[in-house]
Amino acid sequence: MKTAVFDPAPPWKAGRCEILTLWHGCTRLDSEGMSAGIDLTRSRLNLDFGRGFYTTTLRRQAVHWAIRRFDSRFVSKIDNWPVVLRFAIRRVELTELKSLSFVLAGYQNEDYWSLVQHCRGSRPGNMNDHLGPVTDDGQWYDAVSGPVVADWRQRAALIGMDQISFHTKSAMALLNGAITSGKTERYECQSNL
């Protein structure tokens, strides 16, 4: 009797997963502000990986972000509601970006936590003022991916969530190209959460 454990895996085919779908949760008013492109200066400074445009590979997480973003502050604005933005990015385009990736956020992962603590602890005007992650040669990383932080002071990450942040003009060009393409297969704003 043959068991599945010993069956060979099907052959991997390049191009099967040519497109990576990224999601961003925000409000309708925020999304309208991005219609001509994303402006990094509108991003908060002290996020997990510094100032950047944050996305996820999980639609449910983007929905959560959108609902959190749309809170009681916006109740008086009738024409506003939570939305998620969908970006379809070709993986080959992502490989052209200078990227930093973290798979795990274990308590002992010093590289991950030192970056998060540095970025989360940044405040405008202090010597730690920091826009995002920098390579050894002083260049900005275009993109950073890794777990979502629940409490950076206690080194706790959320299980089952991820984030990919974009930090530079070249990274923005990739996302803005999807927005301004006018093609719904590359970019879409969804309000049916």
Give residue spans per PLM region.
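Short aromatic-glycine-(Arg/Gly/Cys) micro-motifs in beta-strand/loop hairpins
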Residues: 20, 24-46
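Conserved NAD+-utilizing ADP-ribose enzyme module
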Residues: 1-20, 47-49, 63-64, 68-193
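Acidic, aromatic-lined catalytic clefts of primarily extracellular/periplasmic carbohydrate-active enzymes
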Residues: 52
